[in-house]
Amino acid sequence: MAAPARRLCHIAFHVPAGQPLARDLQRIFGFQPLAVREAGGWRQLALRSGDAVFLVNEGTGPREPLYGLDPHHSVPSATNLCFDVEDVDRAARALAARGCIMPVPPTRVRDAQGTATYTVVSSPAGNLSLTLLQRAGYRGSFLPGFRPLPCTPGPGWVSHVDHLTLACTSGSSPTLMRWFHNCLGFHHLPLSPGEDPELGLKVAVGSGRGGLRLTALQTLPNSTVPTLVLAESLPGLTSEQDQVEQFLTRHGGPGLQHVGLYTPNIIDASEGMAKAGGRLLTPPEAYYQQPGKEEQILASGHKPSFLERQGILLDGDKDEFLLQVFTKSLFDEDTFFLELIERQGATGFGQNNIRALWQSVQEEAARAQGT
């Protein structure tokens, strides 16, 4: 591996000036402003909840935004993942030797609190770039060049990033998996026993309706780096687009489709977000009518009626449960969304929940089209 990622520092978005993403992250999802930078036509606002940090880059300018680049993408998008590495200069040399393109070479930024060094690497995943950051010893609240903002305690709904899901073109997962392995040290994480890394986990969603292929990647076991999930469509017999194909069309190619945010209490978090105006996906009614679903929910210590009212999905076995709720898209283009996830011993993603998400997205698309 050329530059093993040690932890996720932040996820960056690029949106037009005035787009409400930063406001919504605060008002609906409980993120709190951490630091800001305004220069050269850019307004860069870092927001935090627990260890999860989002950097919202608004506007455009003659120079690149600090710690990233301007993707010149036609729609709002999650455009950058920033990872901490041990030595940026060494990582850049190793990546260059592998043929990687670095639109921003190793750059040092200094302020009164210390120094950080970063480089930006183009990835094969659409408009997604990767920032490799070295900031050991930096004493500021975020990064050099940013002005710290007064810290106000938030509701604590989100503790950290659980996983990152990339929407990929059909057949591209093996190539992407090798790239992330060779360049950042990610390894295949089986989602089912005996899973072939080249094939991933196939989740069929219905007769003739295709499905999804999921390939999960992680760095070292017990690492704080979130799991990376590659999602691509499986061909079906109908012309109906699934959520991955819809993302590729509306986003203009592959990219970061959603971020799974870990919550220690999905009941409180989903209820609070809904009261704040959050738009959560409604699971299909049949999901809660499945044989054994009520008993499964009761065994987890929850009330079926409440989970259904909040749109919370539950999957699991014995004493290990997975609870998930998904937002509608944060952008008008109906692309990127967020997921809240609470794990009660479960480590996977729940095939039944994946099918329910697929159907929820299809039903939401049908409602939007008035069909």
From Swiss-Prot:
Primary localization class, coarse: mitochondrion
UniProt keyword Transmembrane present: no
Superkingdom of the organism of origin: Eukaryota
UniProt subcellular location: Mitochondrion
E.C. numbers: 1.13.11.46
PANTHER family assigned to the protein according to its UniProt record, in alphabetical order: 4-HYDROXYPHENYLPYRUVATE DIOXYGENASE, 4-HYDROXYPHENYLPYRUVATE DIOXYGENASE-LIKE PROTEIN
Name of protein: 4-hydroxyphenylpyruvate dioxygenase-like protein
Organism: Rattus norvegicus
